[in-house]
Amino acid sequence: MELNSLTAISPIDGRYSNSTKLLRNIFSEFGFLKYRLYVEIQWLKKLINMHQILEIKKVEKTDILFLDNIFETFNEEDAISVKNIEKETNHDVKALEYFLRKKLSQSKKLSPFLEFVHFLCTSEDINNIAYALMIKNARDEIILPLWKKIINFLKNASFQYRNNSLLSLTHGQPATPSTMGKEMVNFYYRMQRQYHKLKKIEILGKINGTTGNYNAHLVAYPKVNWHAVSKEFITSLGIFWNPYTTQIEPHDYIAELFGCVSLFNNILIDSNRDIWGYISLNYFKQKLIDQEIGSSIMPHKINPIDFENSEGNLGLSNALMNHMINKLPISRWQRDLSDSTVLRNIGVVFAYSIIAYNSVLLGTNKLTINTSQLLKNLDNNWSVLSEAIQTVMRRYTIENAYEKLKKLTRGKKIEKVDIHKFIDKLNIPKIEKERLKKISPSNYIGAASQIIDEIK
């Protein structure tokens, strides 16, 4: 059976392939091979440019272009060649080395230097840098832009709905009113913090040999400062240098990065559930799309499926991330291989998150505010003004203010007239009575509208 979106086992490459196809060039087996090939070539170029390595004679610019072209033209046919070599070697990085050596043998100028391909490197020197570049590209080119779209929706919604008063619910029960805009800005602020944090996380790489001590390096070229060379090479690739490692880069930065992503995802789950609830309360309506069907038997249904889909995929992504956060920083002695199979699933982690982000963006585009329902719920809950009244009473030292409002309102259906009768009987200045009577559930929103102006 040919592999396609219908025959794929995982919905990542099946049902949701349109959302995840951007990841294929990064995290597929082809993508991983190409990133590793890039690292091998860049390291060879670094060695070529080192004047201390006398065995490499002068190389012309055209020869460097030949090297670069091997990477730039790397295609699926080349990847299949590497995999065929791997069938014999049973070692993926060595197979890639042999592939590159074969390519270089076609160059008269470069063929004398075949032994400098993968020179001084353990497989992890290549792999860890490849993963670092893959993660960096996924973060910068895919994840952060999607986060920005979600954050921008929340920011725009904060201003758009800043004056739409909302009956708050604490413990699921009526509470002091807010505005829909203020509720959106709460999520905006939380997600914005994680956005800036993710941008700043240092993605690390190492190239220091079998156990991190440059043993082979110093045997071959004892006068070279390989520690400095390592730093120069790593930072030239646009990532940060880890100077102290075992055979592997310890993956702490991956755990840190996934901690940030999983927290963002949890905030988004919180937002999804709140918006889902507001749809259920009819505070938000969903735009009707004639061709769509909400239920196979109930024709009237318009379900909040985008927010539900997002929540489910965020949960899957977080479950895998939490395993990686706990697993990846731990390796026996100078290394064991248990991280290898886990690292190959980094693309899966990002894929589930990306499916969720795209889904929630679909959902937010269908939302319209239902002002009449918001006001109706507020007008049915005059008891929420008990907080304001008892606070003013306490200001004027009226004894048992809280208890008196509790007796009036708790567990009872209170109307506007009941509140005003109670205010009339209070022993407070007339001007305060008039001020209290001007308060209603829809305008008792504190500074909810104003503080939105402070967001950036």
UniProtKB/Swiss-Prot annotation:
Its EC number is 4.3.2.2. GO terms for biological process: 'de novo' AMP biosynthetic process; 'de novo' IMP biosynthetic process. Keywords: Lyase, Purine biosynthesis. SUPFAM superfamilies: L-aspartase-like. The active site is at H171 (proton donor/acceptor), S295 (proton donor/acceptor). CDD domains: PurB. Pathway: Purine metabolism; AMP biosynthesis via de novo pathway; AMP from IMP: step 2/2; Purine metabolism; IMP biosynthesis via de novo pathway; 5-amino-1-(5-phospho-D-ribosyl)imidazole-4-carboxamide from 5-amino-1-(5-phospho-D-ribosyl)imidazole-4-carboxylate: step 2/2. GO terms for cellular component: cytosol. InterPro entries: Fumarase/histidase_N, Fumarate_lyase_CS, Fumarate_lyase_fam, Fumarate_lyase_N, L-Aspartase-like, Pur_lyase, PurB_bact, PurB_C. N(6)-(1,2-dicarboxyethyl)-AMP binds at residues 15-16, 90-92, 122-123, 247, 296, 301-303, 309, 335, 340-344. Transmembrane segments: none annotated. It catalyses: N(6)-(1,2-dicarboxyethyl)-AMP = fumarate + AMP; (2S)-2-[5-amino-1-(5-phospho-beta-D-ribosyl)imidazole-4-carboxamido]succinate = 5-amino-1-(5-phospho-beta-D-ribosyl)imidazole-4-carboxamide + fumarate. It is an enzyme of class 4 (lyase). GO terms for molecular function: (S)-2-(5-amino-1-(5-phospho-D-ribosyl)imidazole-4-carboxamido) succinate lyase (fumarate-forming) activity; N6-(1,2-dicarboxyethyl)AMP AMP-lyase (fumarate-forming) activity. Belongs to the lyase 1 family. Adenylosuccinate lyase subfamily. Homotetramer. Residues from neighboring subunits contribute catalytic and substrate-binding residues to each active site. Catalyzes two reactions in de novo purine nucleotide biosynthesis. Catalyzes the breakdown of 5-aminoimidazole- (N-succinylocarboxamide) ribotide (SAICAR or 2-[5-amino-1-(5-phospho-beta-D-ribosyl)imidazole-4-carboxamido]succinate) to 5-aminoimidazole-4-carboxamide ribotide (AICAR or 5-amino-1-(5-phospho-beta-D-ribosyl)imidazole-4-carboxamide) and fumarate, and of adenylosuccinate (ADS or N(6)-(1,2-dicarboxyethyl)-AMP) to adenosine monophosphate (AMP) and fumarate. This is Adenylosuccinate lyase. The lineage of its organism: Bacteria, Pseudomonadati, Pseudomonadota, Gammaproteobacteria, Enterobacterales.
